[in-house]
Amino acid sequence: MSKTPLSIVHPWHGPVLTRDDYESLCCYIEITPSDSVKFELDKETGLLKVDRPQKFSNFCPCLYGLLPKTYCGDLSGEYSGQQSNRDNIKGDGDPLDICVLTEKNITQGNILLQARPIGGIRILDSGEADDKIIAVLEDDLVYGAMEDISDCPGSVLDMIQHYFLTYKATPESLIQAKPAKIEIIGLYGKKEAQKVIRLAHEDYCNLFM
């Protein structure tokens, strides 16, 4: 009896991003709020790898991962620059990041889930576009009814923004008030998030298809 070799779908290239014009999204989760290690997808192998231990006391306050078949390239960078009033902004060359809100205690990464985008955070990281889409887990009992970022509690948005402002900072840089590499330009709602996702999807198609 012959054995058929198993093939693993690459989380970045395999799953279908959306079937309904970016209303519902397939998301690949890399990090959970309980992780004391920063995991990230190895783009070459499709395996989840250890990027680095979390060195300081900040933990990601939500599920965090990427959107399959997205890439922050020329279109994403140009649009971010336009919306930020900055010149020569490029995409960061990675899949588009996503934060997923849920009241459930999901403690395992390296999973796929369906979520609905409600908005996003426009971020520049060392002068590169590095937006974070904010979404809610489909049918979540607490967050599932939210339609737009205006429905999300401000305290939740504050925690997410604080994490991204500080997760790369050292105590020394904070004490000495050194200029931050991470700059939050602002928040945006669902329609803008869908446009950011569409441009990142087009960047992916231009690069890989």
Swiss-Prot record:
Ligand binding (Mg(2+) 2): 97
Catalyzed chemical reaction(s): diphosphate + H2O = 2 phosphate + H(+)
MF terms (GO), sorted A to Z: inorganic diphosphate phosphatase activity; magnesium ion binding
Cofactor: Mg(2+)
Cellular compartment(s): Cytoplasm
Positions that bind Mg(2+) 1: 92, 97, 130
Residues that hold substrate according to the record: 38, 52, 64, 167
Domain of life from the UniProt record: Bacteria
Keyword Metal-binding attached: yes
Assigned keywords, A-Z: Cytoplasm, Hydrolase, Magnesium, Metal-binding
Keyword Magnesium (UniProt): yes
InterPro entries (UniProt xref): Pyrophosphatase, Pyrophosphatase_sf
Gene Ontology CC: cytoplasm
Pfam families: Pyrophosphatase
EC number: 3.6.1.1
Enzyme class, broadest EC rank: hydrolase
Biological process terms in GO annotation: phosphate-containing compound metabolic process
Signal peptide: none
NCBIfam families referenced in this protein's UniProt entry, alphabetically: PRK00642.1
Record family assignment: Belongs to the PPase family.
Quaternary structure note: Homohexamer.
Purpose: Catalyzes the hydrolysis of inorganic pyrophosphate (PPi) forming two phosphate ions.
Protein name per UniProt: Inorganic pyrophosphatase
